[in-house]
């Protein structure tokens, strides 16, 4: 095996010189994943997406924008936790059966956790990706900043530091390309493994999917909602936000691969 082969040796000069090759390899691998996602919505479950998302011109732009953005994804991961204002106690799988909500006699609402697994200090923006994963793409595109303003107001009202909503939205958006690629990568293992391609032919609407198995339902709708959100953000799509962020911090491709 590889363990018995001579160890590969490198140097700073060789590493820098190989950057274009690594970047090209990364784009090729990610491009194949994106193609698989587009093939899924085009040929297996087109009813999940609005016509504008299925337009070949949009899909070509989306793929190019994703590839330009994803090269900086690793740096975004480090950026996400670089300021304690944007890190808090979170639960990354807080389904309704993991918590309780009880209205007391005086009308106040008491809330708490029943299942503390996956409860930890985490970058808020990354958790928001899951919180809003079921939101209709067009609706989310029109109200994302308002949602983060409401959260920021409540966070401060209950004793937390002021979380600038515009910055929280930026951090949320910077994580979006990785979020989409992560969902697409689950097509074979989580979607088609539960509902094979031939069974999708018997479905006609999102309502049919909502009655289906958990993983197939969640990941297929997250892919569709993510594509819709990207489309409805227009020129302010996540790829553009990523490139503006990279330029603001003087980042180049060589910093990220």
Predicted regions and their residues:
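Catalytic loop of the DD-peptidase/beta-lactamase superfamily, centered on the K-T-G motif
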Residues: 213, 217
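Catalytic and GAP-homology cores of small GTPase regulators
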Residues: 94, 98-99, 122
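Surface-exposed helix-capping loop/turn segments at secondary-structure junctions
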Residues: 1-8, 155-165
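Short secondary-structure subsegments characteristic of cysteine-rich extracellular domains
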Residues: 167-176
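Active-site activation/catalytic loop segments of kinase-like enzymes and analogous catalytic loops
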Residues: 118-160, 177-202, 219-229, 233
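Conserved catalytic-loop position in the HRD/HxD motif
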Residues: 93, 115
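ATP-dependent phospho-/nucleotidyl transfer catalytic cores
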Residues: 1-91, 102-106, 218, 222, ...
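Conserved protein kinase catalytic/activation segment
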Residues: 98-112
């Amino acid at each position: 095996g590889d363990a018995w082969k001579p160890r590969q040796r490198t140097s700073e000069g060789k590493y820098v010189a190989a950057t274009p090759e690594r970047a090209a390899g990364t784009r090729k691998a990610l491009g194949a994943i994106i193609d698989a996602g587009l093939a899924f919505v085009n040929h297996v479950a087109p009813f999940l997406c609005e016509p504008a998302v299925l337009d070949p011109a949009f899909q070509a732009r989306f793929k190019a924008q994703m590839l330009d953005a994803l090269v900086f994804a690793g740096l975004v991961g480090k950026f996400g936790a670089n300021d304690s204002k944007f890190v808090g106690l979170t639960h990354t799988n807080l389904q309704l059966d993991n918590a309780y909500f009880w209205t007391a006699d005086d009308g106040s609402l008491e809330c708490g956790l029943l299942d503390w697994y996956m409860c930890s200090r985490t970058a808020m923006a990354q958790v928001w990706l899951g919180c809003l994963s079921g939101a209709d793409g067009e609706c989310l595109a029109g109200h994302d900043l308002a949602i983060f303003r409401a959260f920021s107001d409540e966070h401060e009202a209950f004793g937390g530091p002021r979380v600038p909503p515009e910055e929280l939205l930026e951090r949320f958006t910077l994580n979006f390309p990785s979020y989409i690629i992560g969902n697409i990568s689950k097509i074979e293992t989580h979607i088609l493994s539960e509902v094979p391609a031939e069974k999708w032919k018997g479905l006609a609407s999102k309502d049919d999917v909502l009655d289906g198995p958990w993983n197939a339902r969640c990941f297929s709708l997250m892919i569709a909602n993510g594509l819709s959100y990207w489309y409805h953000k227009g020129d302010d799509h996540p790829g553009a936000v990523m490139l503006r962020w990279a330029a603001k911090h003087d980042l180049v491709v060589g910093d990220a691969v």
